[in-house]
């Protein structure tokens, strides 16, 4: 946003949300080229002279609005040219350009809300690991958890209808609808592996924006009821008028939807629940009875079906007791087990024993799924026995060692917050031995002979990062004490999951 504030008349667009004229600005097409286009594809276009041709973009938009426009068959869509340009190239340009201008209302609202609340923007809030300190603080005091899979809209029109709540410009929405139907060919947008099935990889930014806008609208309704009701529940009885206003607001929301959804809302006068989401999976946790959790389940199902017209089933939401269920979330197995302990105590002449059962969040490394990810990447077989990586055998020794060490360190970095670190030793063993077998395969030698020649220097490369980090925490302690330290370390610079950890 900061790059374009000198060009855009933000005050006018803030008032009217007229975004359609922006797509015909030359600097938008140039910014779309700089942000998203592949340079290799540009070189293949003979009519492209290192500048974004706004005239051709206008012609392509005009063709989409025409009833009898020339259709390019799917068999030769990558080779055909129309007026000397590549259709995929300029469809990508329109996609990137629309993504840039459609993000303007969201960015303006975010900046204004941060400035109005005087909130300091912290980059640590982007870290995935910032979720786990929250879970450690809240989960030991809760009883039940609901594992929710957010349903995906299977039709493009649902995403367009969702976007109209934020973008008031009808022309932009019409252009988006024409563009999606022109280039999707009726394909389903989302698939079962919880990732976006992109009909063209070049349009990933646009589809991610549309999906995030759908999630934003869903959470705006859900979190409004949760936050407002929780606030009123914690305040004194002097805010009776605020409580009446909230219940009236909930009634207004219910009138918008069908009668079934109105019946569900009436049960949720005082919800008090914790909510965490990452990608297409969310967690609801509460201290109340299972009855309230079941009410929340049917509330969410009714919200998706009645408001967003997305099919959902109560069976997609699993309610379990935290002390008896392990939660699979963000590559960790998390639960809150009861750890009974006997504490002897004495008061005057009477002695007695106190049964204490403290609850603490356990975050465990999922060994079996991780081994499955390593086997899929050809580092080991299905049983976890290390094998060589033949596709890397043509690299230099330095590159081979560096790749294995980087994978091992990234996994150690991500799973540093595990409460039980013994599982990581097996993962490191698989990667180390796979590295040795790959090097031995390259040099056509046995593993024993190669290790004898190389020595123990190779194994030290896999453990240096953790020891260097602990030396910063305990600079004055001995090396032995640092090796014995097994506390949790949550890094606040992890903005994406490790590819091997993302086994869901």
From Swiss-Prot:
Keywords linked to the UniProt accession: Chloroplast, mRNA processing, Plastid, RNA-binding, tRNA processing
Pfam families noted in UniProt: Intron_maturas2, MatK_N
InterPro entries: Domain_X, Maturase_MatK, Maturase_MatK_N
Membrane-spanning intervals of the chain: none
Main localisation: plastid
GO BP annotations listed: mRNA processing; RNA splicing; tRNA processing
Cell compartment(s), UniProt: Plastid, Chloroplast
GO molecular function terms attached to this record: RNA binding
The UniProt record lists the keyword Membrane: no
GO CC list: chloroplast
Role played: Usually encoded in the trnK tRNA gene intron. Probably assists in splicing its own and other chloroplast group II introns.
Family (UniProt): Belongs to the intron maturase 2 family. MatK subfamily.
Name this protein carries in UniProt: Maturase K
Gene: matK
């Amino acid at each position: 946003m900061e790059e374009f504030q000198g060009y855009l008349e933000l005050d006018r667009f803030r008032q009217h949300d007229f975004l359609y004229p922006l797509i015909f600005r030359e600097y938008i097409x140039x910014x779309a080229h700089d942000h998203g286009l592949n340079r290799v594809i540009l070189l293949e276009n003979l009519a492209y002279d290192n500048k974004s041709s706004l005239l051709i973009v206008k012609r392509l938009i005009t063709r989409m609005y025409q009833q009898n426009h020339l259709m390019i068959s799917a068999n030769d869509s990558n080779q055909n040219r129309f007026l000397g340009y590549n259709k995929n190239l300029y469809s990508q340009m329109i996609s990137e350009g629309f993504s840039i201008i459609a993000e303007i209302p969201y960015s303006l609202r975010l900046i204004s809300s941060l400035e109005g609340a005087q909130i300091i923007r912290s980059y640590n809030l982007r870290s995935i690991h910032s979720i786990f300190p929250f879970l450690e603080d809240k989960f030991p005091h809760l009883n039940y958890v609901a594992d929710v899979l957010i349903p995906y809209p299977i039709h493009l029109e649902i995403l367009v209808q969702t976007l109209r709540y934020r973008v008031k410009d009808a022309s932009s929405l019409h252009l988006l609808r024409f563009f999606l139907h022109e280039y999707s060919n009726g394909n389903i947008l989302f698939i079962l592996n919880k990732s976006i099935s992109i009909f063209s990889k070049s349009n990933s930014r646009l589809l991610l924006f549309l999906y995030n806008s759908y999630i934003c609208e869903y959470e705006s309704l859900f979190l409004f009821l949760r936050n407002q009701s929780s606030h009123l529940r914690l305040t004194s009885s002097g805010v009776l008028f605020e409580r009446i206003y909230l219940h009236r607001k909930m009634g207004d929301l219910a009138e918008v939807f069908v009668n079934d959804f109105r019946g569900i809302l009436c049960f949720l006068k005082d919800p008090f629940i914790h909510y965490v989401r990452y990608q297409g999976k969310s967690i609801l946790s509460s201290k109340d009875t299972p009855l309230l959790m079941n009410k929340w389940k049917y509330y969410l199902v009714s919200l998706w079906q009645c408001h967003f017209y997305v099919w959902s089933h109560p069976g997609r939401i699993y309610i379990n007791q935290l002390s008896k269920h392990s939660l699979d979330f963000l590559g960790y197995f998390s639960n809150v087990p009861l750890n009974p302990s006997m504490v002897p105590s004495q008061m005057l002449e009477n002695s007695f024993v106190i049964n204490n059962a403290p609850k603490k969040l356990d975050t465990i490394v999922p060994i079996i799924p991780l081994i499955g990810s390593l086997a899929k990447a050809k580092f080991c077989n299905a049983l976890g026995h290390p094998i060589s990586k033949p596709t890397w055998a043509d690299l230099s020794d330095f590159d081979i060692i560096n790749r294995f060490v980087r994978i091992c360190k990234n996994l150690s970095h991500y799973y540093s917050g595990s409460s039980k670190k013994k599982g990581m030793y097996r993962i490191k063993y698989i990667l180390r031995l796979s590295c040795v077998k790959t090097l031995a395969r390259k040099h056509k030698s046995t593993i024993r002979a190669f290790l004898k020649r190389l020595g123990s220097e190779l194994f030290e490369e896999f453990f240096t990062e953790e020891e260097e980090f602990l030396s910063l925490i305990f600079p004055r302690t001995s090396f032995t004490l640092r090796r014995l330290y097994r506390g949790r370390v949550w890094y606040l610079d992890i903005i994406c999951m490790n590819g091997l950890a993302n086994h869901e």
